[in-house]
């Protein structure tokens, strides 16, 4: 094999090796940062790893919200109407957080089966529309109708 051709081949192989290693590192980073969504039924059935950060969605069970007096600690239960998951959270809850309403909680399941939440997201009704948007649509409708 000609020395120039051999050198080119080595450079191409080295480049491919670098691309392969970089691709492997990127895929590994993506996999470790994925947050999977689960239901309370899946958690109760033991289908969830306790060492991963997960998201759990459902309704806040009526009568389950317990706030620590003078503190930010809250305990509540999320249900999908079939099974329930107890949640522990320390922080300020969203304004739309209410019993009987939808919520998505992110955190880790402890060995005791309680979800230690790091983030609580309150879901609003799919028919909800901010007042400003409703006013704008109404004004647009009036100008079109005229």
UniProtKB/Swiss-Prot annotation:
Coiled coil: none annotated. SUPFAM superfamilies: Heme chaperone CcmE. The chain crosses the membrane at residues 9-29. Pfam families: CcmE (PF03100). GO terms for molecular function: heme binding; metal ion binding. Heme binds at residues 124, 128. Residues 30-146 are periplasmic. Keywords: Cell inner membrane, Cell membrane, Cytochrome c-type biogenesis, Heme, Iron, Membrane, Metal-binding, Signal-anchor, Transmembrane, Transmembrane helix. Heme chaperone required for the biogenesis of c-type cytochromes. Transiently binds heme delivered by CcmC and transfers the heme to apo-cytochromes in a process facilitated by CcmF and CcmH. This is Cytochrome c-type biogenesis protein CcmE. It comes from Laribacter hongkongensis (strain HLHK9).
């Amino acid at each position: 094999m000609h020395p120039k051709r051999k050198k080119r081949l080595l450079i191409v192989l080295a480049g491919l090796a670098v691309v392969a290693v970089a691709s492997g590192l990127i895929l590994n980073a993506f996999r470790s940062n994925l947050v999977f969504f689960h239901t309370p039924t899946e958690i109760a059935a033991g289908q969830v790893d306790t060492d991963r950060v997960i998201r759990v969605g459902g309704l806040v069970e009526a009568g389950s919200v317990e706030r620590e007096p003078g503190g930010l600690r809250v305990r509540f239960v999320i249900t999908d109407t079939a099974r329930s998951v107890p949640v522990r959270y320390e922080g300020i809850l969203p304004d739309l957080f209410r019993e009987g309403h939808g919520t998505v909680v992110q955190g880790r399941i402890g060995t005791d089966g309680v979800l230690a939440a790091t983030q609580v997201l309150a879901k609003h009704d799919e028919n909800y529309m901010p007042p400003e948007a409703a006013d704008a649509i109404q004004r647009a409708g009036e100008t079109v109708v005229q």
